[in-house]
Design a protein with these regions (language model features):
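Feature marking well-ordered beta-strand scaffolds used for ligand recognition
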Residues: 8-136
Length: 136
């Protein structure tokens, strides 16, 4: 049993130099974003009970910039487009859109209705397991 455990712990020439713990929740997704103005690097983390933005510019000392509480869900997926983070969940919370230029976490929207692009009708969006953004 011991040789299998040692094999399972291979680090592939990686070293842990910092970490950040959330004592009350678990994560389900992580995505990266770089601030185009100052080059600061951020980990965007989908948590069971919300969304967090962690500054990892100094990887030995990650700092949580903000946290947005949301409906509890095992799955939360994060993607970015420009300076915005888009977060989906299976918890019927719609789409969370966060303006990443506001590091206070105060600029965000929960969206559950969209206007159809061709006929103008309202289209309801409540939940999704995953999110993909076509950059083209």
């Amino acid at each position: 049993m011991m040789p299998l455990m040692a094999l399972g712990q291979s680090n592939f020439n990686l070293s842990l130099i910092g970490s950040f713990d959330w004592p009350t929740t678990e994560g389900s997704d992580i995505w990266g974003w770089v601030n185009p103005v100052d080059g600061s690097e951020y980990a965007l983390v989908g948590l069971n009970d919300g969304f967090a933005c962690v500054n990892v510019s100094n990887p030995t000392n990650p700092v949580q910039e903000f946290y947005i509480s949301d409906i509890n869900s095992t799955w939360r997926d994060v993607k970015t487009w420009g300076n915005f983070a888009y977060i989906t969940t299976e918890a019927d919370a719609g789409l969370l859109i966060v303006d990443l230029t506001d590091m206070t976490g105060g600029t965000y929207w929960h969206v559950s209705n969209f206007t159809h692009p061709t006929n103008g009708s309202s289209v309801e969006f409540t939940a999704a397991h995953n999110l993909f953004i076509d950059e083209n």
